[in-house]
Amino acid sequence: MDTTTSNPRIEASAKYIRMSPHKARRVVDQIRGRAYEQAPMILEFMPYRVCDSISQLLSSAAANANHNFGLSKTDLFIDAIQVDGGSFLKRIRSGARGRTYPIHKPTCHITIVMRMDSGWRNKISLRRFGK
């Protein structure tokens, strides 16, 4: 964790989330680069199961910023968020003639990096979306 007080780097990670990394990346791409206040609203209206895990992780990162650096949650934005593949849970399915077939249930690791919002980021996002 970066200990400089000018623009600290706040990290939070969740490991072994029982979701395919491909499905989690679909959700993560929607909130990357957004302000902290916008991200929970976006996640709330998305119909995917992984949104709950990402929302919990997001609130954990904001709590880390508040507790460790004394930053307000309104000043934060998501600088980086990444989804990496985890290990597979291996299960067995019964097959014909006494055979067994493997089932691989994927897991993923999600890492969020948040930073303090300096005013230029809001101007760029407003310009990008034409508001």
Curated annotation (Swiss-Prot):
NCBIfam families (alphabetical): rplV_bact (TIGR01044)
Cysteine pairings via disulfide bonds: none
Transmembrane segments: none
Record keyword Electron transport present: no
Superkingdom to which the source organism belongs: Eukaryota
Keyword tags: Plastid, Ribonucleoprotein, Ribosomal protein, RNA-binding, rRNA-binding
Subunit-level organization: Part of the 50S ribosomal subunit.
A Pfam family hit: Ribosomal_L22
Cell compartment(s), UniProt: Plastid
Function: This protein binds specifically to 23S rRNA. The globular domain of the protein is located near the polypeptide exit tunnel on the outside of the subunit, while an extended beta-hairpin is found that lines the wall of the exit tunnel in the center of the 70S ribosome.
MF terms in GO: rRNA binding; structural constituent of ribosome
Keyword field contains Ribosomal protein: yes
An annotated GO cellular component: large ribosomal subunit
UniProt protein name: Large ribosomal subunit protein uL22c
GO biological process terms held by the UniProt record: translation
Family as reported in the entry's similarity comment: Belongs to the universal ribosomal protein uL22 family.
Organism this protein belongs to: Aneura mirabilis (Parasitic liverwort)
